[in-house]
């Protein structure tokens, strides 16, 4: 058990913010919070050392609901470009490198460490089309004790041939990732169905992923209407779809 003392800010429920000046957080040996207190309960072992942070502020860890792990090296790069040329010029060439498991492990380790350093302990993460690299990413989150939804990306059109997977390959990879996490995970790292966006996914792929989501109950992440160029392109690709 560990005990921390500081000014504590947290939300016991989604619509309630609570502040406890110079309060205490008691954490069990398994990492779960025993309780948050204004004063320590008398039944606690007072011989345990309290880690006192003085007037510092203790808050819950951050959640990142949309992050691309293989774009870690591209942070801040060529922000003068719109999305579509940026993807083709910088992002797709970088993501292609994750076919190499050693490269994936090296960069993903840095990515996960950076999240940890910045206090982001839970994330919804895009990987790439590569099953082994995506499994490596999931395992690194498990090893770090962090929570994540990790997605094997679906792409089978309008992208480099080196960065495409068939519908069958994607579904096989998703099943293997789910089985791996069911067997080796700790419950905090889970798979998420991840079609990149409409321009890169055929109707057949999207339909199959929808069926897989209904079958498994897995959540889905993607992109929608990020800028006008993308919207216009989707209208050309899917003229029979309306919103």
List each model region and its residues.
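Metal-coordinating catalytic core of metallo-dependent amide/deamination hydrolases
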Residues: 132-243
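N-terminal-biased segments
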Residues: 58-100, 163, 167, 222-233, ...
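Alpha-helical scaffold segments that flank or form the walls of functional sites
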Residues: 26, 75-146, 171-186
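Divalent metal-coordination and catalytic microenvironments
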Residues: 7, 25, 31, 55, ...
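Flexible loop residues that form catalytic
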Residues: 12, 68, 128
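Residue-level detector of flexible, active-site-proximal loop/helix-junction positions
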Residues: 40, 57, 155
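N-terminal metal-binding scaffold of metallo-dependent hydrolase/deaminase domains
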Residues: 1-45
């Amino acid at each position: 058990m560990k005990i921390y003392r500081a000014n504590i800010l947290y939300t016991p429920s989604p619509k309630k913010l609570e502040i406890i000046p110079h309060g205490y957080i008691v954490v069990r040996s398994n990492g779960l919070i025993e309780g948050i207190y204004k004063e320590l309960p008398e039944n606690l072992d007072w011989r345990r050392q309290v880690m006192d942070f003085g007037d510092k502020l203790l808050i819950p860890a951050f959640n990142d609901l949309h992050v691309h792990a293989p774009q870690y090296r591209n942070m801040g790069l060529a922000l003068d470009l719109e999305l579509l040329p940026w993807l083709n010029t910088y992002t797709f060439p970088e993501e292609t490198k994750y076919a190499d498991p050693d490269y994936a492990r090296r960069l993903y380790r840095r990515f996960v460490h950076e999240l940890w350093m910045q206090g982001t302990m839970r994330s919804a993460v895009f990987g790439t089309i590569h099953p082994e690299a995506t499994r490596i990413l999931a395992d690194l989150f498990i090893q770090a004790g962090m929570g994540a939804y990790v997605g094997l990306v679906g792409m089978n059109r309008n992208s480099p041939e080196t960065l495409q997977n068939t519908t069958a390959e994607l579904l096989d990879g998703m099943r293997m990732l789910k089985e791996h996490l069911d067997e080796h995970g700790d419950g905090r790292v889970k798979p998420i169905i991840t079609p990149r966006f409409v321009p890169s996914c055929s109707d057949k792929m999207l339909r199959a992923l929808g069926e897989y989501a209904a079958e498994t109950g897995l959540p889905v992440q993607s992109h929608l209407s990020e800028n006008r160029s993308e919207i216009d392109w989707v209208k050309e690709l899917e003229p029979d779809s309306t919103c």
